[in-house]
Amino acid sequence: MNSDYEIAKEKDISELFDLQLRAFESEAEMIGSRNVPALMESFEENCADFKNWTVLIKRDESGRIIGAVRYREDGDHIEIGRVMVAPEHRNRGEAMGLMTAVEELTQAKVFELYTCTKSYININLYEKLGYRTYKEERGDRDLSFAYMRKTID
């Protein structure tokens, strides 16, 4: 794995939660709804869910977390969740780097994620990385989600 990335530890949860709120605030603005799951989650829920995921992080020169992606493995299948980059570090390839690092780290064959159908910037990024939408569903908070998959031969 690229030395720019590391696996988050429990001591990082508070900083990750702060990053999550800052990163997904712009998502809420873009889609016109605050019903974004990452913004609806409490700190306590976030802490409890941490153990269910592996979280890959990137820090800046000062040691502050500037990007993260969580994932979980099931055989050769990876579920990706909560790709997030600090607003002041966007458009520098950080999200793409995190996603690529997960692929390299896991050596899995199938990667899946979901995002709001109005998240055009995210969908564009995922498509550049080789993800394709395989279904769309309306969520329980009046949002529709695109489920995307990438398969590596």
Task: Give the residues covered by each predicted segment.
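Conserved GNAT-fold acetyl-CoA-binding loop/helix
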Residues: 18-46
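A short helix-loop-beta-strand connector motif used in the catalytic cores of GNAT acetyltransferases and
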Residues: 45-57, 79
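Conserved beta-strand in the GNAT
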Residues: 64-72, 77-84
